[in-house]
Amino acid sequence: MLGLTEAEKIKICLQKQVNSSFSLHNGFGGNLYATEEKRMFELVKPKAGASVLNQSTWIGFGDSRTDQSNSAFPRSADVSAKTADKFRSLSGGSLMLSMFGPPGKVDYLYQGCGKHKVFYEGVNWSPHAAIDCYRKNWTDIKLNFQKSIYELASQSHCMSLVNALDKTIPLQVTKGVAKNCNNSFLKNPALYTQEVKPLEQICGKENLAFFTLPTQFGTYECKLHLVASCYFIYDSKEVYNKRGCGNYFQVIYDSSGKVVGGLDNRVSPYTGNSGDTPTMQCDMLQLKPGRYSVRSSPRFLLMPERSYCFDMKEKGPVTAVQSIWGKGRESDYAVDQACLSTPGCMLIQKQKPYIGEADDHHGDQEMRELLSGLDYEARCISQSGWVNETSPFTEEYLLPPKFGRCPLAAKEESIPKIPDGLLIPTSGTDTTVTKPKSRIFGIDDLIIGLLFVAIVEAGIGGYLLGSRKESGGGVTKESAEKGFEKIGNDIQILRSSTNIAIEKLNDRISHDEQAIRDLTLEIENARSEALLGELGIIRALLVGNISIGLQESLWELASEITNRAGDLAVEVSPGCWIIDNNICDQSCQNFIFKFNETAPVPTIPPLDTKIDLQSDPFYWGSSLGLAITAAISLAALVISGIAICRTK
């Protein structure tokens, strides 16, 4: 083509595409222009109510509102049939009723296993139940009972009511009853009385009894028992014994003789009030399996005959659902207070009064909505609600306790953006890419890329950059290693700064709960900032990675055109060729530049980006690392979608 005149020469280039509608994205080793951009993650909003992390590893404990055997089910229920099947429930029951067994009340054997335990019960022992038995108001005992249940349940996989403890009682006592207990008494503790004969023995004999907490109850292993240590409280010695006998005492000892519970008015003062009727107090004891003794002053013996047994094998979430009556019945809020004062317990509360569908007390629509999440699996459960989206960020701080892969609080504008839509690489600047410098295209070369990114928990991994021929451009092994070294160093700097900040915060810890909550919030904010910083570094490396990969693909594309042209076209600059219009007509040019039009012009897809966080971002900044794999997929015959610019 040396003899061609200027009129016979035609210059064909890839058309310039970049204009003011493109945005520039800077990265490590290369930059990109893009028609669109999007945030690496969107903010998620938690859904109010309860959910679970795994449908196969949770269990519920309930009453008529979760009881499938109730004659009004499902209208009587606050959960779906699917969820009700996960509950151990009986209408009229509650864990506390089964623990104490007041006369005339439902006595249900609560037992079951699950990593996550959901409690929706308690209303059946409330002021409306009007249970007396030497105590007009049981709310404080209920509060301590529920709190102990939640605490031990959070540390156990299995729990069970033990409704019959082995015991040995003294011969001089017999089962007693009380007028203020429906002329009966509780099943636990059992009341034993001693008849005193004034002529023979004015004061009676001291009572000595024994009970055994088993290591196993049926198929349930027992590492720890919840035992109610009950005793009477007298205002004065005279109220207890008008005959002038000794002081009142009811004390529990372990096998070594150590006092583990009870009251001893021989060393502790009476209340000093003016009442003439005792009240009963019950303390919640956490005791190991073994043989225990009970010593009491004459006349009365309160004997532990039941317990709740826990295997203490697995820590897990606990959810307590507010259990209150509808209109016309008095409720207490012991469940609420117990959960809020127990670490690891998430409380589900209503915002409106209970309004039932089946009756005033069964089938509340608001509660159904709050518990509908139990039908699904969530990535995160917290006091603020549950989340099943994959984003690591939420607009507002999620209140603890929280479990799973919980998002961190962040502002939308702080989340890094990645290029989207049509992508155009700029000239590379990475000094580790040594060849082919002369082959790297400029900003006006158009290409389409599909990106898939997966972030997994395994340490920083390698990049998949597509094919790279020895004669082509792109990133070298040394370049990739240096890129990873840089991102690794930068992330370590971020994490080091975060750890320093946490150490400073540790110095400010006080023993009050608010200070600890404030500290937790500040630590989480530091982790959020560190994660955002890490994502910024990842974004920059990904942009550079895409840019270099696209540059390589463009070089390979130009090489293919040059090879097809042979002597019919001369490459005068990257992406531009001179041809003889007389020798190579339109069909010839179609063969060279449009591959004989055998490939259809593709519909230009947007950048397809997916980022999945497999580790818990709440703990990022510790020993967990990040691994990134990125793959670029290009259309096989991209040239068919590229416009041609002709000049003479």
Curated annotation (Swiss-Prot):
| Residues with glycosylation annotation | 19, 54, 137, 182, 388, 545, 596
Fusion domain-2: region residues: 358-643
Give residue ranges on the Cytoplasmic side: 645-648
- Where does the UniProt annotation locate this protein? Virion membrane; Host cell membrane
| A GO cellular component entry from the record | membrane
Q: Quote the catalytic residue positions.
A: 64 (nucleophile), 359 (charge relay system), 362 (charge relay system)
Q: Which reaction does it catalyse?
A: N-acetyl-9-O-acetylneuraminate + H2O = N-acetylneuraminate + acetate + H(+); N-acetyl-4-O-acetylneuraminate + H2O = N-acetylneuraminate + acetate + H(+)
Parts of the chain on the Extracellular side:
8-623
- The protein's superkingdom reads Viruses
HAMAP family linked to this entry: INFV_HEMA
Give the record's family classification.
Answer: Belongs to the influenza viruses hemagglutinin family.
Return any one Pfam family short name.
Hema_esterase
Source organism (scientific name): Influenza C virus (strain C/Nara/2/1985)
Encoding gene (name): HE
Q: Which UniProt keywords apply?
A: Disulfide bond, Fusion of virus membrane with host endosomal membrane, Fusion of virus membrane with host membrane, Glycoprotein, Hemagglutinin, Host cell membrane, Host membrane, Host-virus interaction, Hydrolase, Membrane, Signal, Transmembrane, Transmembrane helix, Viral attachment to host cell, Viral envelope protein, Viral penetration into host cytoplasm, Virion, Virus endocytosis by host, Virus entry into host cell
Q: What is this protein called?
A: Hemagglutinin-esterase-fusion glycoprotein
Q: Report TM segments.
A: 624-644
- Modification comment: In natural infection, inactive HEF is matured into HEF1 and HEF2 outside the cell by one or more trypsin-like, arginine-specific endoprotease.
Q: Where is this region: Fusion domain-1?
A: 8-33
